[in-house]
């Protein structure tokens, strides 16, 4: 029967493995909420599901755009609506999985009225200082460029206090009362997993993928400045050694995992130790089925 769950966790937490295993065993549909898996040309840097996985599991949210095409959270809302319609029509479970918690949060809370992103030349520190002065209730990290630009864009276009504007124009979210499970890892063990995954990505051809991408597309594109690719660009330009490349990807991925862990505290989720997660979720799927 149809039901839906969300599976969250940091990068390298094993979300995709758990989701794919459940999808195969229970014929579930999977919606990927990942900001890189949407791109057709980025496979290794995105840790995209394998071709075999994509061929044997009904996936939504993967291989939708070229890296020079722009998207926002509305793309994932549309993909969710397609995935839910597909699953409902066939009475199948739906698993929402991904490390980009912002998309899931927006799907739960709802979108606010559209505004254009600011084209201001102000840097993050300058926008953040303005924000603290005008709108101290708007909680945001200083390094969150997207949300800082969005905040400034709202203020420039409406002259309203952005936190009040967002509250006033909030629309109903598409996800209601969904059970959220978070894969939990000891921090030190997760660091080791990230280090191992970085090495595997390099062994599997990350540099070759980067060479092709940088030969075809502008290196300033947002997608090509993601972790894994921006460090490859430095290596290919002769700015860092291979050892530094591996270390930088590992460090930056570990920092990302820390930010993801912090963001995921916004959700009312059930923490699952990875080693026990599959057994617990199998039981849930068996009961629901």
Curated annotation (Swiss-Prot):
It comes from the Bacteria. Its cofactor is Mg(2+). Residues 34-37 are annotated as: Interaction with substrate tRNA. Keywords: ATP-binding, Magnesium, Nucleotide-binding, Transferase, tRNA processing. It is an enzyme of class 2 (transferase). It holds the Pfam family IPPT. It catalyses: adenosine(37) in tRNA + dimethylallyl diphosphate = N(6)-dimethylallyladenosine(37) in tRNA + diphosphate. The record marks 100 as: Interaction with substrate tRNA. ATP binds at residues 9-16. Catalyzes the transfer of a dimethylallyl group onto the adenine at position 37 in tRNAs that read codons beginning with uridine, leading to the formation of N6-(dimethylallyl)adenosine (i(6)A). This is tRNA dimethylallyltransferase.
